[in-house]
Amino acid sequence: MLELRLVQGSLLKKVLESIKDLVNDANFDCSSTGFSLQAMDSSHVALVSLLLRSEGFEHYRCDRNLSMGMNLGNMSKMLKCAGNDDIITIKADDGGDTVTFMFESPTQDKIADFEMKLMDIDSEHLGIPDAEYHSIVRMPSNEFSRICKDLSSIGDTVVISVTKEGVKFSTAGDIGTANIVLRQNTTVDKPEDAIVIEMKEPVSLSFALRYMNSFTKATPLSDTVTISLSSELPVVVEYKVAEMGYIRYYLAPKIEEEEDTNP
């Protein structure tokens, strides 16, 4: 038996909005420690990893490990029926083929039940190794979203470079080029406005902007985004989910075609 009660129901709605365009179908894994998801996008270029720890729920019951295959588009449609202030309860029976979403208004004068069929989804669980990153950038999430959106109007690839000068986002396209440089800034009134750069080694990597723009759909979840970069590894773009977990996106860097054509 699974029963999870989340007082901040709007959190779950925001989580779904941030992953449904990247991943169509995925397994939600429930264990005694939390509610998680790990899935690749359809082109196997990006990976999304979500964790909502059990202690973040008002009530959390998971008798045994359970994996629930869901179509994220359908799940999002159901969650859109919940008000932003509603309390959301997720229920499923062991071995059952449906999951129930219950939405309660804060005054408890309205309760809605939505039942959704589960799917059988074959998914490989990818081990994500803990790694040491050459450079880590923490910045306001709305600033990162704005940069990705602005650069998309010029080109389709962003080069992220971290040096002792700061972090530079650049692109080039048919109409010209764009460079945006952010310098470390920790002397701000609000901690969420700070730009913090931890650089062990300089890095410069290229990524597809359409994926970066997709990742920024998680902006409503967190005021801050953390971008971890290493020359040999996928970038990690992480947004915290309140005090209860995180959503992390992994994206492999683009290899420059010019390198392949050199003799």
Curated annotation (Swiss-Prot):
HAMAP family: DNApol_clamp_arch
Main localization of the protein described in the UniProt heading: nucleus
Molecular function via GO: DNA binding; DNA polymerase processivity factor activity
DNA-binding residue intervals: 61-80
Record's GO cellular component terms: cytoplasm; cytosol; nucleolus; nucleus
Intracellular or extracellular location(s): Nucleus
Record InterPro entries: DNA_clamp_sf (IPR046938), Pr_cel_nuc_antig (IPR000730), Pr_cel_nuc_antig_C (IPR022649), Pr_cel_nuc_antig_CS (IPR022659), Pr_cel_nuc_antig_N (IPR022648)
PROSITE patterns given in the database record: PCNA_1, PCNA_2
Lineage: Eukaryota, Viridiplantae, Streptophyta, Embryophyta, Tracheophyta
Function: This protein is an auxiliary protein of DNA polymerase delta and is involved in the control of eukaryotic DNA replication by increasing the polymerase's processibility during elongation of the leading strand.
Subunit structure: Homo- and heterotrimer. Interacts with POLH, ATXR5 and ATXR6.
Record's protein name: Proliferating cellular nuclear antigen 1
Keyword flag Metal-binding: no
GO terms (BP aspect): DNA replication; regulation of cell cycle; regulation of DNA replication
Species per Swiss-Prot/TrEMBL record: Arabidopsis thaliana (Mouse-ear cress)
Source species, domain of life: Eukaryota
This protein's UniProt keywords: DNA replication, DNA-binding, Nucleus
Entry's family note: Belongs to the PCNA family.
Pfam families (alphabetical): PCNA_C, PCNA_N
